[in-house]
Design a protein with these regions (language model features):
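Residue(s) in the substrate-gating loop at a strand-loop-helix junction
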Residues: 118
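SDR active-site lid
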Residues: 151-215
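Active-site-adjacent segment of SDR/Rossmann-fold oxidoreductases
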Residues: 123, 144-155
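Conserved glycine-rich Rossmann-like NAD(P)H-binding loop of the short-chain dehydrogenase/reductase
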Residues: 8-22
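Substrate-binding pocket helix/loop in short-chain dehydrogenase/reductase
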Residues: 75-76, 80-85
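Active-site helix of classical SDR
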Residues: 99, 134
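The beta1-alpha1 cofactor-binding region of Rossmann-like NAD(H)/NADP(H)-dependent oxidoreductases
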Residues: 17, 38-49, 81
Length: 248
């Protein structure tokens, strides 16, 4: 929605056809231009179809925002390995597939490739091994794509929101792969998706490499450089105080 407000032609991709139709309808009712494509980002052929839809509708791709995400909340001791595979499939491979098919168009437009990572992609979060690993993988992948395209005018940005009041928190996987269904944190104290979207758009406009949000993201990035052991202890204490923390 925020991109459409800025005048962009928007192509949305997600698994829920009903939600896609509602959002696109809302954008169009307000004078924006948008279309959609149902896509499961764990399937490369569906990611290709998403990019083909964008090119067919609007002639190319200027910005690709890889925002599909899945989280978890369980100790590595307890978690089923299939949960970790699922997280990598969505968070990492979904980014790889969409980038692969969009890259020629982004190179042609000197456009922007954006990965929505996390504070968990800056420093490991206890109880989120698979999530942190997938976000670190995303970051390493995007940084390498940036370097490979230094002479081609491609902008690559890694955006790292903190805790955000979004559906990803309710769909976070537990040790056995079931959704946790509720969040242990106070949603009212978190950033809203709309706030995150506005910050990401500003980052794209400024062609930033790394887009940190809120004090926690900036502090994590800074403290890790000078006191990583302290940061380990701080993250441990934050997580152990969560209601029903798996660390207890």
């Amino acid at each position: 929605r925020e991109c459409a407000v800025q005048g962009a032609n928007v192509v949305l991709g997600a698994r829920s056809l009903q939600k896609l139709q509602l959002i696109v309808g809302d954008i169009r009712s307000k004078g924006g231009e948008a279309t959609y494509c149902a896509v499961d980002v764990t399937k490369p052929e569906e990611c290709r179809n998403l990019i083909d839809t964008a090119v067919g509708e609007y002639g190319g791709v200027d910005v690709l925002i890889c925002n599909a995400g899945l989280s978890m909340r369980a100790l590595f001791d307890d978690v089923d390995l299939e949960v970790l595979h699922r997280l990598m499939d969505v968070n990492f491979w979904g980014t790889v597939y969409c980038t692969k098919y969009a890259l020629p168009y982004l190179q042609a437009s000197h456009g922007s490739l954006v990965g929505i990572s996390s504070v968990a992609g800056l420093h490991g979060l206890p109880g989120r091994t698979g999530y942190s690993a997938s976000k670190y993988a995303m970051t390493g992948f995007l940084e390498t794509v940036r370097i490979e395209n230094l002479k081609k005018g491609l902008h690559v940005m890694v955006a790292c929101p903190g805790f955000t009041a979004s559906n990803v928190r309710f769909s976070a996987l537990t040790a056995d792969g079931s959704s946790q269904g509720e969040t242990p944190r106070d949603e009212a104290k978190m950033m809203t998706p709309e706030q995150v979207a506005r910050i990401v758009i500003r980052g794209i406009e400024k062609r930033k490499r790394l887009c940190l949000m809120e004090a926690e993201g900036r502090a994590t990035h800074f403290i890790k450089k000078f006191a990583p052991g302290f940061l380990d202890r701080m993250f441990y204490m934050v997580m152990v105080r969560e209601p029903d923390s798996p660390l207890k």
